[in-house]
Amino acid sequence: MAKGKRTFQPNNRRRARKHGFRIRMRTRAGRAIVAARRNKGRKSLTA
C-alpha cells in the first residue's frame, strides 16, 4: 500500500502570514486568542 506524502512542509513566510501576530490583531477573535495566551502566561503568543 502506498502512503501519502508528508503533510507538513515547513515554510516560515506562510506560517507567519497564517498565524502571525499582525494577522491575529486584525480580528476581534484573533485579539481574544492573544489575550487568552497572555493571561495564561504563554512565553510565545503567536507563530
Curated annotation (Swiss-Prot):
The keyword Ribonucleoprotein appears for this protein: yes
Highest taxon in the source lineage: Bacteria
Entry keyword annotation includes S-adenosyl-L-methionine: no
One Pfam family, short name: Ribosomal_L34
Keywords attached to this entry: Ribonucleoprotein, Ribosomal protein
Record-level GO cellular component terms: ribonucleoprotein complex; ribosome
InterPro entries from the UniProt entry: Ribosomal_bL34, Ribosomal_bL34_CS
GO molecular function: structural constituent of ribosome
GO BP terms in the entry: translation
Protein family according to the UniProt entry: Belongs to the bacterial ribosomal protein bL34 family.
Matches recorded under PANTHER family: LARGE RIBOSOMAL SUBUNIT PROTEIN BL34M, MITOCHONDRIAL RIBOSOMAL PROTEIN 34 FAMILY MEMBER
Official protein name in the record: Large ribosomal subunit protein bL34
Species the sequence originates in: Corynebacterium diphtheriae (strain ATCC 700971 / NCTC 13129 / Biotype gravis)
